[in-house]
Amino acid sequence: MRIGTKSVLYGAHCAVIHPWFLAAAWRKLYGFPWDIRLWCAFWLHDAGYFSKRDMDGLDGETHVELGARIMAFLFGESWGAFTAAHSRYWAKRNGRQFSRLCVADKLAFVLTPAWLYLPMARATGELSEYMLRAKERQAGCEHFTAIESAQLNSPDAGEWLKGLKSYTRRWVEEHRDGGADHWTVTVPPAAFQVADGGSGR
């Protein structure tokens, strides 16, 4: 089973857990999500991780496309664009404005407790990829504090998570009302190789 599938089934993007944190994040940022189309986006935005060989690499970055296509089919192109732009890296690389779904999605990560997030990410194998990619991204970004940079370079997953959550919370506070994203550095995605029989991560 590929890592993207595992993530959606029982990992960091678990389809029965993550959407609830996303809904809670949306409520904190923008009020209660009364629009049923928002709830559809909450459940569909990460559907494209199914069958992906990696999470943040060449394959994983395209995960936004499936949910966007479904949302566009159901509710129109504007909702497809809204869903696709939930990834700030995808949005920046494609010259798009990140959506409010992106901001709420980042806050959802912050709201997910470490005691839940870390075991899920470890169980699927995502954690090692996330830790590596976070180091690559902070190396080219001036918006990490010294403490956050030290935490992101720590081999301890708990410390790493504290650093990433601190940075992500500040990104949310800075961008909750939209505007240009000068924080996100688009490091070229790369295939993330693992020795698991060639299934990818």
Where are the model-predicted features located?
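Short helix/loop segments within enzyme catalytic domains
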Residues: 74-82
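Conserved, aromatic- and glycine-enriched, well-ordered alpha/beta core segments
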Residues: 48-53, 64-68
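Conserved catalytic core of two-metal-ion nucleotidyltransferases
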Residues: 82-89
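Transmembrane-helix signature of polytopic, membrane-embedded enzymes
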Residues: 37-39
